[in-house]
């Protein structure tokens, strides 16, 4: 991520499949990359080493990469493309990220019924920010962003939120759901602190304190009024302990809007 007074990631890696971009990662990358000196690399990883399979994968992968590059070129954003053969999709993405010196990887969350094994391992092993996105609509058309908070927000996440808001004109609302694990006093303190810190990045946020017996149900209901919900991985890999798996999957199923999961580089989860 660029310095505070600058605007976006400098090197964004976007793995693409052999189909169209169902989660609109190309559009999301155009929002998050620094338009002045940033660049995006699209990569397609093939694991089929047979001649026929490899040829077909290279062809379809090349088409996907070229299509994404064309979209960004029309927006004046620098981009490159690669096709990589690796023992697994995970290895190929990690190798490409290291060679490219990516400061963020964007990957799609296609099946909202569960977090895939690939995404789980990528969140654990990538040495940069990882952004997992499930698109309900074009992210460029985002007007409102909902951000549930459970701990003091990290500077990396605040900067990403500020970039999204400034590029799209979207409003940001921090929300805290009180219930079994939190009190109104704790919630108000976190909400005020989150809004104050985001203001340091030039973005004013709204706050909402909600009381509910089920945070999952409450967030699902709240999400109906927003375009994107951003969840993170705080509290010492809190996402893995209380959201990742059951709760994350349930939140994804209940969400009535696009869902963005953000892991910043400094979050290092324990091994399973």
UniProtKB/Swiss-Prot annotation:
<dbReference type="InterPro" id="IPR006016">
    <property type="entry name" value="UspA"/>
</dbReference>
<comment type="similarity">
    <text>Belongs to the universal stress protein A family.</text>
</comment>
<keyword id="KW-0346">Stress response</keyword>
<protein>
    <recommendedName>
        <fullName>Probable Kdp system regulatory protein KdpQ</fullName>
    </recommendedName>
</protein>
<dbReference type="Pfam" id="PF00582">
    <property type="entry name" value="Usp"/>
</dbReference>
<comment type="function">
    <text>Has probably an essential function in the transcriptional regulation of the kdpFABCQ operon.</text>
</comment>
<keyword id="KW-0614">Plasmid</keyword>
